[in-house]
Every structure is written in structure tokens, then in C-alpha cells.
Amino acid sequence: MSPFVPGSSLRIEGSAGGPLAGLTFAAKDLFDVAGHPTGGGNPDWARQNPVPTRHAWAVQTLLDAGCTLIGKTITDEVSLGILGENAFEGTPLNPAAPGHVPGGSSSGSASAVAQGLCDTALGTDTGGSVRVPASFCGLFGIRPTHGRLHLTGMLPQAPSSDTTGWFARDAATFARVSSVLLGEPIPEARPAKLIVATDAFGFAEAETAAALAPALERLKRLIPDWREEVMAPQGLSVWGRAQRTLQPVEAWETFRTWVERDNPRFAFSVARGLLLGAAVPEVERGWAALMRQEARGRLRHLLPPGTVLAMPTTPFPAPKIGLPLPMLNPIRDAILCLCAHGGLAGHPQVSIPGARAEGRPVGLSLLAARGADTLLVRAALAVEAA
């Protein structure tokens, strides 16, 4: 199915002569485009909120750089989803694994790039919404350092975790777009040290870990100074529980006024997520906030300048479309356990394609110190060329 928002049609030419001239992009339907409704994946949000009069910062930045906007893409409702299935707008095609989910919530953006309909696409990442689709669709994808990019004109979900992100099929395009959005050139120097997160590779399914082994070996040859470490001493499942607590609480705070005022329609899983956020006890919030500080301290210790950490982006490849809810809950929980560090600690992360498990793509991720986003892009270029 099409990755674009049903019934929408737009094309806005980029500025002539910019560094991205000749490239095209799509924008997740959380980004404002002047004169077009921001739907957020929910028909009532689009109907009950005003049409924006200005472009989102990320959209304007790409247009100013010469990139041409060709459409707005489907998202999980109000970005509350990790698999990419939208009850109102459908599930965008995953061309790398037909019959399987594209990953979410930036599902349409990943699908559009993977299908070759555009060169790059904007997504958002709170609990994995760029990293997961990048892994499932076989793309380069980035979750930048939290707070590095302006989020003006982007519909929020959980502000303490929200970031803008983007996708590309090849490392060269990924680097061009990254340099523009990050506002600095990609450095020539590669990372000096590599950490292999043994707990993350152990958490992934055996076939996924095995599929990533050749890429990991190439990375070790590129960065000979490497060692193994446990990323989450408290346990990846503990970090997952903390993010699973904090994110719905903030999502409820973000959307509470709208929900109580306008009584919008939601799919069951989205409504449940919002209501769970409303019901989290104060003691649980306090515990989760403490775990966030633990995660931040651990990654700050592991990732001094010049060091990168390698881990699987997702614990397994894309699941089938339309699985029943009892099967989906453990799948979502497992994915979040490998993605929670992004929302908790805010470090930049790049997912690199190139491996397949069970015939479907899986990504290898690299993390770096906060602010070292372009170092990760350089590493992605080196891995693709190796």
C-alpha cells in the first residue's frame, strides 16, 4: 500500500542550487507543511486542529537546501506505535519484507524511501520510531542527540524523548542530508574506539545476532581498538520498563486536553497506551526517573568522545502484518528493551543496513557521545565501503 497519507497530494520545490538540489524527500505526518493539515495519523486530530501556516523547521531546512518535498507520509496514530500499523490509514508496504510490518511509527517515511519513491524522508523517534523502521526496511536511519535539532512545527508525543530523524537507502545520500540537518560537515576521522554491547547481542534472537556478525567483524577491522562491555548493568528489560513508564505518562500529558475536550477516536492499542499513561502511580514514575539517571550515567561513562558502541537495532526482523494482540505485546516489549536507551539517555544512534535474518533485513546500530552525531555518520560511510 502507498506510504503517503490518503487523499493528500503536494509538491514543493526546493531552493535552486542548494547542497541537496536534485534530491526529493517526504515528511512524516507529524511535521507541519504550510497550507496542508497535520494529521498525526488520526482523522480527528486533522479535523479538530488548525491547518498550519508555516513549515516545520526540519521541512524548511531541507527545502532551503534544495531538497524537493513530494508528500506527507503515514504514521502510527499520534506516533504511539512501534510496528507501523494504522487502523485508519493502513499499513505502508515494506518492500524489503512483503507481508511484514515496516516498523513505526515513522512507517510511511521508511516505506517511501525503501520503495525508491524519494531519496530521503523525515521521521521522528521517541522510543524507536526511526531506528525500528530503518532496521525492518533495510535503511540507514538516525536518531540524533536529544535536543540537538529544532522541533518547531513537529507534533510532540513525549518531549523528554522526542527527536527528529531521517532515512536514506545509501550512505552517501544519508551523509549529505545529515550534514545539512545537523549543521556541520561530516568529519574525515573515524571513531578511535569500539565497544561491543554483549548484553544487547545476547538479547537479540540468535539468528539476528548471527546475521549481524559479518558486519560486526568489518567494524572491528575498521576500529581495531575494541572491547566488550555490558551496556545496561540493571538489565535491558529494566531500562525498557522505565521507558515504557515515562513515555506514556508524557504522551498523556501532551494529548490530555484534546482527548478530554474532543473525545477523539483511537484504535484500541493507542487508547490503551494513553490511558495507561494517565494511571501510572507516582512511585512508579519516581522509580523510572531514577532509572533514567542510571542509564544516562552509564552511557556517559561508556561513550567518551571518539568511542562508538555497537548493538543490534532490533532483536529480530519485521513481524508479520496483522498479528493478534496477545502476540504483539511481547514483540513490542522486546523491541523497546533494545531501544529504550535512546529515550532515556538521549545519545545519538545510527542504524546501518546490510544484514538479513530469516530473509528479512536487520540493522546494526552505533551509538556515540551526545553531540557526536556526525562521527556516527562517518562510521556508517566506512562500514558501507568496507
What do these predicted regions represent?
Residues 23-40, 245-291, 353-360:
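Short helix-loop capping/hinge segments that flank enzyme active sites or metal/cofactor-binding pockets
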Residues 25, 179-248:
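Gly/Ser-rich, acidic/histidine-flanked active-site/gating loops
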Residues 86-90, 138-141, 245-246, 327-329, ...:
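Short, hinge-like loop/turn segments at secondary-structure boundaries
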Residues 209-229, 256-261, 285, 289-306:
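Acyltransferase
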